[in-house]
Amino acid sequence: MSSRYRVEYHLKSHRKDEFIDWVKGLLASPFVLHAVSHEGDYNDDLATTQRVRSQYADIFKDIEGLIKDKIEFDSRNMSQDEIEDGASSQSLNILGQSRLNLLVPSIGTFFTELPLEQAFLWEDSQRAISARRMVAPSFNDIRHILNTAQIFHFKKQENLHNGKVLRLVTFDGDVTLYEDGGSLVYTNPVIPYILKLLRCGINVGIVTAAGYDEAGTYENRLKGLIVALHDSTDIPVSQKQNLTIMGGESSYLFRYYEDPEEDNFGFRQIDKEEWLLPRMKAWSLEDVEKTLDFAERTLNRLRKRLNLPSEISIIRKVRAVGIVPGERYDEASKRQVPVKLDREQLEEIVLTLQNTLESFAPSRRIQFSCFDGGSDVWCDIGGKDLGVRSLQQFYNPESPIQPSETLHVGDQFAPVGSANDFKARLAGCTLWIASPQETVNYLHRLLETD
């Protein structure tokens, strides 16, 4: 489900982010205590705003300390190899649990410290959070504060002598780089920022659920980007080649190339032996096929049970299976009209598919990802965490890029079932955005010179 669907968001437990909800709860007390009107007395109102700002800032400072303690605790509790293999602090309790784990049991791994107090004060200056009396700090407020803190961290690392600078930025496609179902046209405002990342020597990967085993489809959807990259004379070809596409979440890898003699450019597929992680190579083809067969049967049963229109079709690919909307001819308008799935139908399908596959033996021996794309539902073999980890290894096999040097930008981070960017949190730092314009705004702040 793309981030634009926010109606009744907080009524659905599978759509909640427990950490953000916990932060909202902490901020509720100062909001309620100071949610008073001063009947037009500007000085009293200003004093109240300052008190609220100070209390909010203190809360974020305390959370900042809890995150720092958790990072130190986790570093003692697990080795780097265990982190790379996908182990979480929830599964390793050699030394018990950090205080933040006890307060928020579902909390994941933090790869960097987050200057939350500084981020709050910056966001407050832009959004006047402390000045509000009727609307408490919201999910979106906290999402923006977390994103800004991550940006501030990487900006700080640039100025440190031995800082862990950013080496890899990965992006989702739909709703992150372009509108849902769209493409990256030449006029897209995100393109200059992607070029600047490459110009700065930062690797760029587009990790998308769209799975195709040939380059043409990706070249068409990203035409504006690759034309702009080809036309950029101030970026060496060696750095242009640091643009990659990971398709099907972790199934197909393509790398940008230029052939000056033939004046050709585009994407070239990379042989799987060059980038597959050892754990992915260990998956049996039989388990993959059985998982997709089982998922396809489940989708067929759901189509009958939910009495879906015949135009709704099920598509089977080599590494994925999904249920997608269709079209029918409308006699009144004399044209084809879309036949869509309702939001409730999409959620029923993705949650049922996820739960049934979790109890299916072959699918437990591999990794799969079920997600709701806003108009369709898919089950992919692999996941975005593996896609990001594969890129970390591919760009520098001798010295793989670390999670603390990686930033994934995406719009689907709901914690259960319906969001495929969520798993990317296992492989690196993240920015949770809600529109392509937000992506542009954050990249501008990341790349602007102080």
Curated annotation (Swiss-Prot):
Its cofactor is Mg(2+). It comes from the Eukaryota. Its EC number is 3.1.3.99. Keywords: ATP-binding, Hydrolase, Magnesium, Metal-binding, Nucleotide metabolism, Nucleotide-binding. The keyword Metal-binding applies. The active site is at 172 (nucleophile), 174 (proton donor). One of its GO terms (biological process) is inosine salvage. SUPFAM superfamilies: HAD-like (SSF56784). IMP binds at residues 172, 174, 180, 208, 376, 384. It catalyses: IMP + H2O = inosine + phosphate. Allosterically activated by ATP. ATP binding is a prerequisite to magnesium and substrate binding. ATP binds to 2 of the subunits in the homotetramer inducing a closure of these 2 subunits and the release of the C-terminal loop, thereby activating the enzyme. Optimum pH is 6-6.5. Mg(2+) binds at residues 172, 174, 411. ATP binds at residue 144. GO terms for molecular function: ATP binding; IMP 5'-nucleotidase activity; magnesium ion binding. Homotetramer. IMP-specific 5'-nucleotidase involved in IMP (inosine 5'-phosphate) degradation. This is IMP-specific 5'-nucleotidase 1. The gene is ISN1.
